[in-house]
């Protein structure tokens, strides 16, 4: 999954030996390799020569592939990447959750290049590499990749990487600028790019003038972060319209560079559409959206349901969700609560009332407490459980764990599951699953 071929060494007697992970090798290939780490039960190695290439091998278009840690699978045909991710999902469901989906959904996929609308790039002056570097970390390293372009960033962002290096190198505080975050908003027709610069010392007036000139030249918006996340502010221009659109539902979603939003806007639109179709919301339904964030799912659901309750652990995101609901004229059909869903209990869920449908979209840690609370409710108050749950996941292992609880303890059936290729050319596996309450 991380661009490594997996095999077994043979013992002297011909029996299967320890596992070997070969970076740069693909399934079915015959390669010459060199081990760089040996453990009692496994080895790690790199490819020296490909003797018999896989028919699925392609030439990576990025000159930094293999060094840069931003991508791991550019050498594998995109369709095969999705197939491998699907297999990872199914294997996790089987071996971790002890469950299997009745139906495997058609995968969600889209553009494989220029899709990364959010990114955090490190900044460092490295004299041995010619000066200022701006880029992703090298693979399994704290070093920064010496990169002048990036295939997965939007072309307009990729084009400014070298000028950005030159800009930072010209600042009086160039050694006190550790990172820049990229956030691109996308409406129906236009894009807006914001760069959030982390500064550990104040800018001089000359520095500020340089940032403004860069913004005018590249048509970007500067945000600055002098200390913690709470100190982030729009520097230039001060009025910024940063948003993404969900046109199918007539939703316009404003956000800040520090807000969590999906990296891939095109895939997010498809994901929201499919999730709502799978949720099968009726006009009379009361729906819960757990880990709701800015309201990415909450607001589209509100266009279909009678009422939606969004629950989020971040106070800042809860406030932003309230603002977004009001801006889209949906504040009368939505309600938001700030709760720690990693410690939620059956009593907490019971206090929220009965929901006909539930959408769960947790971070990588998953929704174990929510799943356990639903399992506890099923023992004595099964009538309070939602008939259908749609679970959107960014970690197949925690989805599998929670699926095991929902199926084996809470009385649900895993009806469908499939992958969402939110991060092409990487090992990240996003997925979606549908659970129906058994009668």
For each feature predicted by the language model, list its residue ranges.
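Short, acidic/hydrophobic/Gly-rich beta-strand patch recurrent on exposed beta strands
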Residues: 6-11, 135-138, 321
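Extended interfacial segments that mediate partner engagement and assembly in macromolecular machines
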Residues: 48-60, 66-177
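Terminal RNA-binding accessory module
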Residues: 1-60, 64, 332-335, 341
């Amino acid at each position: 999954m991380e661009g490594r071929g997996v095999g077994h060494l043979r013992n002297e007697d011909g029996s299967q030996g320890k596992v070997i992970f070969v970076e740069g090798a693909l399934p079915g290939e015959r390669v010459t390799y060199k081990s760089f780490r040996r453990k009692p039960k496994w080895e790690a190695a790199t490819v020296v020569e490909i003797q018999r290439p896989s028919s699925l091998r392609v030439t990576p278009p990025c000159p930094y592939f293999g060094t840069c840690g931003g991508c791991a699978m550019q050498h594998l045909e995109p369709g095969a990447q999705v197939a491998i991710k699907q297999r990872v999902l199914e294997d996790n469901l089987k071996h971790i959750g002890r469950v299997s989906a009745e139906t495997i959904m058609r995968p969600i996929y889209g553009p494989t290049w220029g899709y990364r609308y959010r990114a955090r790039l490190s900044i460092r002056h490295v004299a041995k590499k010619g000066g200022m570097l701006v880029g992703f970390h090298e693979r399994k390293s704290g070093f920064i990749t010496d990169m002048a372009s990036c295939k997965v960033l939007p072309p307009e962002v990729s084009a400014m990487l070298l000028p950005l290096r030159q800009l930072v190198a010209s600042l009086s505080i160039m050694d006190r600028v550790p990172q820049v975050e990229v956030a691109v908003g996308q409406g129906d027709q236009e894009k807006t790019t914001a760069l959030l610069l982390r500064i550990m010392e104040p800018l001089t007036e000359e520095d500020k003038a340089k940032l403004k000139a860069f913004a005018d030249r590249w048509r970007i918006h500067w945000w600055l972060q002098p200390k913690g996340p709470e100190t982030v502010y729009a520097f230039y221009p001060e009025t910024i319209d940063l948003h993404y659109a969900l046109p199918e539902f007539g939703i316009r979603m404003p956000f800040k560079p520090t807000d969590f939003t999906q990296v891939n806007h095109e895939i997010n639109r498809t994901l929201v559409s499919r999730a709502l179709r799978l949720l099968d919301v009726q006009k009379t339904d009361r729906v819960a959206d757990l880990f709701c964030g800015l309201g990415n799912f909450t607001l589209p659901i509100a266009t279909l349901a009678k009422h939606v309750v969004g629950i989020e652990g971040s106070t800042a995101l809860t406030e932003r969700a309230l603002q977004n609901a009001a801006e889209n004229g949906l504040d009368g059909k939505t309600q938001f609560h700030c709760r720690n869903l990693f410690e939620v209990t059956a009593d907490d869920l019971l206090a929220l009332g009965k929901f006909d449908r539930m959408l769960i979209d947790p971070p990588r840690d998953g929704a174990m407490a929510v799943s356990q609370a639903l399992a506890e409710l099923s023992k004595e108050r099964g009538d309070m459980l939602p008939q259908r749950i749609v679970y959107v996941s960014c970690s197949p292992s925690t989805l599998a764990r929670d699926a095991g609880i929902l199926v084996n303890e809470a009385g649900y059936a895993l009806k469908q599951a499939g992958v969402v290729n939110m991060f092409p050319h990487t090992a990240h596996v996003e997925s979606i699953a549908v659970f129906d309450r058994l009668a």
